[in-house]
UniProtKB/Swiss-Prot annotation:
Primary gene name: psbA2
E.C. no: 1.10.3.9
Site, as annotated: Tyrosine radical intermediate: 161
UniProt binding sites for a quinone: 215, 264-265
Family: Belongs to the reaction center PufL/M/PsbA/D family.
Assembly mode: PSII is composed of 1 copy each of membrane proteins PsbA, PsbB, PsbC, PsbD, PsbE, PsbF, PsbH, PsbI, PsbJ, PsbK, PsbL, PsbM, PsbT, PsbX, PsbY, PsbZ, Psb30/Ycf12, peripheral proteins PsbO, CyanoQ (PsbQ), PsbU, PsbV and a large number of cofactors. It forms dimeric complexes.
Record keywords: Calcium, Chlorophyll, Chromophore, Electron transport, Herbicide resistance, Iron, Magnesium, Manganese, Membrane, Metal-binding, Oxidoreductase, Photosynthesis, Photosystem II, Thylakoid, Transmembrane, Transmembrane helix, Transport
Protein name per Swiss-Prot or TrEMBL: Photosystem II protein D1 2
Propeptide feature ranges: 345-360
Protein backbone atom coordinates (compact mmCIF):
# COMPACT_ATOMS: atom_id res chain seq x y z
CA UNK A 1 0.00 0.00 0.00
CA UNK A 2 1.40 3.35 -1.04
CA UNK A 3 0.46 6.62 0.67
CA UNK A 4 0.92 9.84 -1.25
CA UNK A 5 1.60 12.94 0.81
CA UNK A 6 1.21 16.40 -0.66
CA UNK A 7 2.30 19.56 1.13
CA UNK A 8 -0.64 21.92 1.64
CA UNK A 9 0.00 25.31 0.18
CA UNK A 10 0.07 27.92 2.89
CA UNK A 11 -3.07 30.02 2.83
CA UNK A 12 -2.74 33.75 2.52
CA UNK A 13 -3.30 35.95 5.55
CA UNK A 14 -6.60 37.16 4.07
CA UNK A 15 -7.81 33.60 3.51
CA UNK A 16 -6.93 32.67 7.08
CA UNK A 17 -8.87 35.69 8.30
CA UNK A 18 -11.89 34.73 6.17
CA UNK A 19 -11.85 31.18 7.52
CA UNK A 20 -11.59 32.44 11.10
CA UNK A 21 -14.44 34.93 10.64
CA UNK A 22 -16.82 32.34 9.17
CA UNK A 23 -15.78 29.38 11.32
CA UNK A 24 -18.52 27.86 13.48
CA UNK A 25 -15.88 26.19 15.66
CA UNK A 26 -15.01 29.43 17.45
CA UNK A 27 -16.28 29.78 21.02
CA UNK A 28 -18.13 32.92 19.90
CA UNK A 29 -19.15 33.13 16.25
CA UNK A 30 -17.86 36.31 14.61
CA UNK A 31 -19.25 36.33 11.08
CA UNK A 32 -19.07 39.10 8.53
CA UNK A 33 -21.82 41.00 10.29
CA UNK A 34 -19.80 40.65 13.49
CA UNK A 35 -16.84 42.41 11.88
CA UNK A 36 -18.98 45.56 11.82
CA UNK A 37 -21.03 44.77 14.93
CA UNK A 38 -18.11 44.48 17.36
CA UNK A 39 -16.53 47.94 16.80
CA UNK A 40 -19.87 49.77 16.57
CA UNK A 41 -21.31 48.25 19.75
CA UNK A 42 -18.02 48.79 21.60
CA UNK A 43 -17.98 52.43 20.50
CA UNK A 44 -21.61 52.95 21.54
CA UNK A 45 -21.06 51.26 24.91
CA UNK A 46 -17.88 53.16 25.79
CA UNK A 47 -19.33 56.53 24.76
CA UNK A 48 -22.56 55.82 26.66
CA UNK A 49 -20.70 54.94 29.87
CA UNK A 50 -18.42 57.99 29.68
CA UNK A 51 -21.31 60.35 28.83
CA UNK A 52 -23.57 58.89 31.53
CA UNK A 53 -20.85 59.49 34.11
CA UNK A 54 -19.25 62.76 33.05
CA UNK A 55 -21.03 64.58 30.16
CA UNK A 56 -21.77 68.27 30.85
CA UNK A 57 -25.35 69.63 30.60
CA UNK A 58 -26.95 69.72 27.14
CA UNK A 59 -29.06 72.53 25.67
CA UNK A 60 -31.73 70.05 24.54
CA UNK A 61 -34.43 72.63 23.67
CA UNK A 62 -32.02 75.02 21.93
CA UNK A 63 -33.02 77.92 24.21
CA UNK A 64 -29.80 78.18 26.22
CA UNK A 65 -31.20 76.25 29.19
CA UNK A 66 -28.96 73.18 29.53
CA UNK A 67 -30.27 69.98 31.11
CA UNK A 68 -27.83 67.94 33.21
CA UNK A 69 -27.90 64.18 32.68
CA UNK A 70 -24.64 62.74 34.01
CA UNK A 71 -23.72 61.39 37.43
CA UNK A 72 -20.99 63.98 38.00
CA UNK A 73 -23.54 66.77 37.56
CA UNK A 74 -25.81 65.64 40.38
CA UNK A 75 -27.83 62.74 38.96
CA UNK A 76 -28.16 59.18 40.21
CA UNK A 77 -28.71 55.92 38.33
CA UNK A 78 -32.47 56.55 38.14
CA UNK A 79 -32.43 60.20 37.07
CA UNK A 80 -29.30 60.10 34.91
CA UNK A 81 -29.32 59.87 31.11
CA UNK A 82 -27.45 60.71 27.95
CA UNK A 83 -29.45 63.78 26.95
CA UNK A 84 -30.59 64.00 23.28
CA UNK A 85 -28.85 66.45 20.98
CA UNK A 86 -30.02 70.05 20.86
CA UNK A 87 -33.08 71.27 19.01
CA UNK A 88 -30.73 73.85 17.49
CA UNK A 89 -29.01 70.97 15.68
CA UNK A 90 -32.31 69.49 14.48
CA UNK A 91 -31.78 66.58 12.10
CA UNK A 92 -28.29 67.64 11.06
CA UNK A 93 -25.62 64.97 11.26
CA UNK A 94 -23.41 66.21 14.11
CA UNK A 95 -20.12 64.31 14.44
CA UNK A 96 -17.26 65.75 16.48
CA UNK A 97 -15.57 67.34 13.46
CA UNK A 98 -18.69 69.39 12.65
CA UNK A 99 -18.38 71.34 15.91
CA UNK A 100 -16.04 74.28 16.44
CA UNK A 101 -14.74 72.70 19.65
CA UNK A 102 -15.25 69.69 21.87
CA UNK A 103 -17.04 71.89 24.41
CA UNK A 104 -19.52 73.00 21.76
CA UNK A 105 -20.08 69.38 20.68
CA UNK A 106 -20.81 68.34 24.25
CA UNK A 107 -23.05 71.37 24.90
CA UNK A 108 -25.16 70.51 21.84
CA UNK A 109 -25.51 66.84 22.81
CA UNK A 110 -23.18 65.28 20.27
CA UNK A 111 -22.63 62.11 22.34
CA UNK A 112 -26.32 61.19 21.90
CA UNK A 113 -26.01 60.95 18.13
CA UNK A 114 -22.72 59.06 18.42
CA UNK A 115 -24.25 56.48 20.78
CA UNK A 116 -27.55 56.10 18.89
CA UNK A 117 -26.08 55.73 15.40
CA UNK A 118 -23.42 53.24 16.46
CA UNK A 119 -25.95 51.34 18.58
CA UNK A 120 -28.44 51.03 15.71
CA UNK A 121 -25.77 49.86 13.28
CA UNK A 122 -24.62 47.38 15.94
CA UNK A 123 -28.05 45.85 16.58
CA UNK A 124 -28.76 45.66 12.84
CA UNK A 125 -25.51 43.72 12.46
CA UNK A 126 -26.38 41.52 15.46
CA UNK A 127 -29.60 40.58 13.68
CA UNK A 128 -27.69 39.84 10.50
CA UNK A 129 -25.18 37.79 12.50
CA UNK A 130 -28.04 35.68 13.87
CA UNK A 131 -29.13 34.92 10.32
CA UNK A 132 -25.54 34.25 9.24
CA UNK A 133 -24.89 31.73 12.03
CA UNK A 134 -28.22 30.01 11.36
CA UNK A 135 -27.28 29.73 7.69
CA UNK A 136 -23.85 28.28 8.48
CA UNK A 137 -25.39 25.66 10.80
CA UNK A 138 -28.19 24.73 8.39
CA UNK A 139 -30.89 26.10 10.70
CA UNK A 140 -34.07 27.91 9.75
CA UNK A 141 -33.90 31.73 9.88
CA UNK A 142 -36.64 32.51 12.40
CA UNK A 143 -34.33 33.58 15.25
CA UNK A 144 -33.36 36.80 13.48
CA UNK A 145 -37.00 37.33 12.47
CA UNK A 146 -37.99 37.28 16.15
CA UNK A 147 -35.14 39.64 17.02
CA UNK A 148 -36.39 42.07 14.38
CA UNK A 149 -39.19 43.09 16.76
CA UNK A 150 -36.99 44.84 19.38
CA UNK A 151 -34.77 46.13 16.56
CA UNK A 152 -37.83 47.73 14.95
CA UNK A 153 -38.86 49.23 18.30
CA UNK A 154 -35.41 50.74 18.88
CA UNK A 155 -35.31 52.10 15.33
CA UNK A 156 -38.73 53.67 15.80
CA UNK A 157 -37.90 55.63 18.98
CA UNK A 158 -34.29 56.52 18.14
CA UNK A 159 -34.48 57.23 14.40
CA UNK A 160 -37.96 57.28 12.80
CA UNK A 161 -39.63 59.40 15.49
CA UNK A 162 -36.95 62.13 15.50
CA UNK A 163 -37.05 62.24 11.69
CA UNK A 164 -40.83 62.64 11.73
CA UNK A 165 -40.71 65.35 14.40
CA UNK A 166 -37.85 67.21 12.74
CA UNK A 167 -35.20 67.01 15.46
CA UNK A 168 -33.13 64.46 17.33
CA UNK A 169 -33.98 66.37 20.49
CA UNK A 170 -37.32 64.53 20.31
CA UNK A 171 -35.59 61.13 20.45
CA UNK A 172 -35.80 58.97 23.55
CA UNK A 173 -33.21 59.92 26.21
CA UNK A 174 -30.76 57.16 27.14
CA UNK A 175 -31.76 56.72 30.77
CA UNK A 176 -34.48 55.42 33.07
CA UNK A 177 -36.36 58.59 34.02
CA UNK A 178 -35.66 60.00 30.55
CA UNK A 179 -37.48 57.02 29.06
CA UNK A 180 -40.48 57.70 31.32
CA UNK A 181 -40.43 61.38 30.34
CA UNK A 182 -40.40 60.34 26.67
CA UNK A 183 -43.45 58.12 27.28
CA UNK A 184 -45.40 60.88 29.04
CA UNK A 185 -44.64 63.47 26.37
CA UNK A 186 -45.46 60.97 23.61
CA UNK A 187 -48.84 60.33 25.23
CA UNK A 188 -49.48 64.05 25.62
CA UNK A 189 -48.67 64.87 22.01
CA UNK A 190 -49.90 61.75 20.19
CA UNK A 191 -52.47 60.03 22.47
CA UNK A 192 -50.71 56.70 21.98
CA UNK A 193 -52.96 54.92 24.49
CA UNK A 194 -55.84 55.37 22.05
CA UNK A 195 -53.90 54.01 19.06
CA UNK A 196 -54.92 50.49 17.93
CA UNK A 197 -51.34 49.47 17.13
CA UNK A 198 -50.24 50.29 20.67
CA UNK A 199 -53.13 48.20 21.97
CA UNK A 200 -51.91 45.28 19.85
CA UNK A 201 -48.43 45.76 21.29
CA UNK A 202 -49.76 45.65 24.85
CA UNK A 203 -51.65 42.46 24.00
CA UNK A 204 -48.45 41.05 22.50
CA UNK A 205 -46.21 41.80 25.48
CA UNK A 206 -48.66 40.91 28.26
CA UNK A 207 -50.09 37.99 26.31
CA UNK A 208 -46.60 36.71 25.57
CA UNK A 209 -45.76 36.85 29.28
CA UNK A 210 -48.96 34.98 30.13
CA UNK A 211 -48.41 32.29 27.49
CA UNK A 212 -44.77 31.88 28.52
CA UNK A 213 -45.75 31.40 32.16
CA UNK A 214 -48.55 28.98 31.20
CA UNK A 215 -46.24 26.93 28.99
CA UNK A 216 -43.42 26.81 31.53
CA UNK A 217 -45.70 25.83 34.39
CA UNK A 218 -47.45 23.14 32.30
CA UNK A 219 -44.14 21.60 31.22
CA UNK A 220 -42.72 21.73 34.74
CA UNK A 221 -45.88 20.11 36.11
CA UNK A 222 -45.84 17.24 33.59
CA UNK A 223 -42.17 16.20 33.67
CA UNK A 224 -41.43 12.51 33.21
CA UNK A 225 -40.10 11.31 36.56
CA UNK A 226 -36.52 10.09 36.28
CA UNK A 227 -35.30 10.81 39.82
CA UNK A 228 -36.17 9.91 43.40
CA UNK A 229 -37.97 12.15 45.87
CA UNK A 230 -34.65 13.20 47.43
CA UNK A 231 -33.10 14.38 44.14
CA UNK A 232 -33.74 17.47 42.08
CA UNK A 233 -35.98 16.82 39.08
CA UNK A 234 -33.44 18.70 36.96
CA UNK A 235 -31.08 15.71 37.24
CA UNK A 236 -33.63 13.68 35.28
CA UNK A 237 -32.64 15.42 32.06
CA UNK A 238 -29.44 14.71 30.18
CA UNK A 239 -28.35 17.23 27.56
CA UNK A 240 -29.02 15.88 24.08
CA UNK A 241 -31.26 13.01 25.17
CA UNK A 242 -33.67 11.70 22.55
CA UNK A 243 -36.57 10.97 24.92
CA UNK A 244 -39.19 13.61 25.68
CA UNK A 245 -38.54 15.23 29.03
CA UNK A 246 -42.23 15.97 29.67
CA UNK A 247 -45.55 14.35 28.81
CA UNK A 248 -47.25 16.60 26.26
CA UNK A 249 -50.33 14.35 26.27
CA UNK A 250 -50.78 14.91 30.01
CA UNK A 251 -50.26 18.67 29.64
CA UNK A 252 -52.71 18.77 26.71
CA UNK A 253 -55.31 16.83 28.66
CA UNK A 254 -54.96 19.01 31.75
CA UNK A 255 -55.23 22.31 29.88
CA UNK A 256 -58.03 21.06 27.64
CA UNK A 257 -60.10 20.19 30.70
CA UNK A 258 -59.16 23.40 32.49
CA UNK A 259 -60.36 25.68 29.65
CA UNK A 260 -61.80 23.70 26.73
CA UNK A 261 -60.38 21.14 24.35
CA UNK A 262 -59.39 23.38 21.46
CA UNK A 263 -57.64 25.92 23.69
CA UNK A 264 -54.81 23.41 24.07
CA UNK A 265 -52.20 22.64 21.42
CA UNK A 266 -51.65 19.00 20.48
CA UNK A 267 -48.64 19.81 18.30
CA UNK A 268 -45.42 20.93 19.97
CA UNK A 269 -44.16 22.69 16.83
CA UNK A 270 -47.26 24.80 16.29
CA UNK A 271 -47.28 25.60 20.02
CA UNK A 272 -43.77 27.00 19.99
CA UNK A 273 -44.39 28.91 16.77
CA UNK A 274 -47.37 30.55 18.48
CA UNK A 275 -45.28 31.40 21.55
CA UNK A 276 -42.72 33.13 19.32
CA UNK A 277 -45.12 34.82 16.90
CA UNK A 278 -47.55 36.38 19.40
CA UNK A 279 -45.19 38.89 21.10
CA UNK A 280 -43.17 39.48 17.93
CA UNK A 281 -46.19 40.51 15.87
CA UNK A 282 -47.44 42.68 18.75
CA UNK A 283 -44.14 44.55 19.02
CA UNK A 284 -44.03 44.92 15.23
CA UNK A 285 -47.38 46.69 15.38
CA UNK A 286 -46.26 48.98 18.20
CA UNK A 287 -43.15 49.93 16.24
CA UNK A 288 -45.34 50.65 13.22
CA UNK A 289 -47.60 52.76 15.43
CA UNK A 290 -44.65 54.81 16.73
CA UNK A 291 -43.45 55.28 13.16
CA UNK A 292 -46.85 56.58 12.00
CA UNK A 293 -47.32 58.82 15.03
CA UNK A 294 -43.87 60.23 14.28
CA UNK A 295 -45.58 61.97 11.35
CA UNK A 296 -48.53 63.00 13.58
CA UNK A 297 -51.01 60.33 12.52
CA UNK A 298 -52.11 60.08 16.13
CA UNK A 299 -54.39 57.93 18.28
CA UNK A 300 -58.17 58.15 18.19
CA UNK A 301 -59.83 61.28 19.58
CA UNK A 302 -63.18 60.61 21.25
CA UNK A 303 -63.18 63.82 23.29
CA UNK A 304 -66.63 65.21 24.12
CA UNK A 305 -68.29 62.60 21.93
CA UNK A 306 -71.15 61.78 24.34
CA UNK A 307 -73.82 64.49 24.84
CA UNK A 308 -77.10 64.59 26.75
CA UNK A 309 -80.42 65.78 25.29
CA UNK A 310 -79.51 69.40 26.08
CA UNK A 311 -76.20 69.19 24.26
CA UNK A 312 -74.14 69.11 27.45
CA UNK A 313 -71.01 66.97 27.48
CA UNK A 314 -71.12 63.72 29.44
CA UNK A 315 -67.48 63.02 30.22
CA UNK A 316 -66.08 59.61 29.32
CA UNK A 317 -62.67 58.11 30.05
CA UNK A 318 -61.53 59.62 26.75
CA UNK A 319 -62.19 63.08 28.22
CA UNK A 320 -60.35 62.20 31.43
CA UNK A 321 -57.40 61.04 29.34
CA UNK A 322 -57.53 64.25 27.31
CA UNK A 323 -57.32 66.33 30.51
CA UNK A 324 -54.26 64.33 31.55
CA UNK A 325 -52.71 64.88 28.12
CA UNK A 326 -53.18 68.64 28.37
CA UNK A 327 -51.65 68.65 31.84
CA UNK A 328 -48.58 66.77 30.69
CA UNK A 329 -48.23 69.01 27.66
CA UNK A 330 -48.37 72.12 29.85
CA UNK A 331 -45.59 70.78 32.08
CA UNK A 332 -43.05 69.66 29.49
CA UNK A 333 -40.69 72.12 27.80
CA UNK A 334 -42.31 74.84 29.88
CA UNK A 335 -39.86 77.51 28.73
CA UNK A 336 -39.67 76.50 25.07
CA UNK A 337 -43.13 77.80 24.19
CA UNK A 338 -45.59 80.22 25.74
CA UNK A 339 -48.63 78.00 25.52
CA UNK A 340 -49.38 74.35 24.67
CA UNK A 341 -50.29 73.95 21.02
CA UNK A 342 -53.51 72.07 21.73
CA UNK A 343 -54.81 74.87 23.96
CA UNK A 344 -53.55 77.69 21.75
CA UNK A 345 -55.25 76.27 18.65
CA UNK A 346 -58.80 76.79 19.90
CA UNK A 347 -61.04 79.82 19.51
CA UNK A 348 -60.06 82.90 21.49
CA UNK A 349 -62.02 83.29 24.72
CA UNK A 350 -62.86 86.91 25.68
CA UNK A 351 -61.63 87.75 29.17
CA UNK A 352 -63.24 91.23 29.44
CA UNK A 353 -66.38 92.23 27.56
CA UNK A 354 -66.19 95.97 28.37
CA UNK A 355 -63.32 98.21 29.32
CA UNK A 356 -63.46 99.25 32.98
CA UNK A 357 -64.26 102.85 33.77
CA UNK A 358 -61.34 104.78 35.27
CA UNK A 359 -61.99 107.79 37.52
CA UNK A 360 -65.41 108.18 36.15
Amino acid sequence: MTTALQRRESASLWQQFCEWVTSTDNRLYVGWFGVLMIPTLLTATICFIVAFIAAPPVDIDGIREPVAGSLMYGNNIISGAVVPSSNAIGLHFYPIWEAASLDEWLYNGGPYQLVVFHFLIGVFCYMGREWELSYRLGMRPWICVAYSAPVAAATAVFLIYPIGQGSFSDGMPLGISGTFNFMFVFQAEHNILMHPFHMLGVAGVFGGSLFSAMHGSLVTSSLVRETTETESQNYGYKFGQEEETYNIVAAHGYFGRLIFQYASFNNSRSLHFFLAAWPVVGIWFTSLGISTMAFNLNGFNFNQSVLDSQGRVINTWADVLNRANLGMEVMHERNAHNFPLDLAAGEATPVALTAPAING
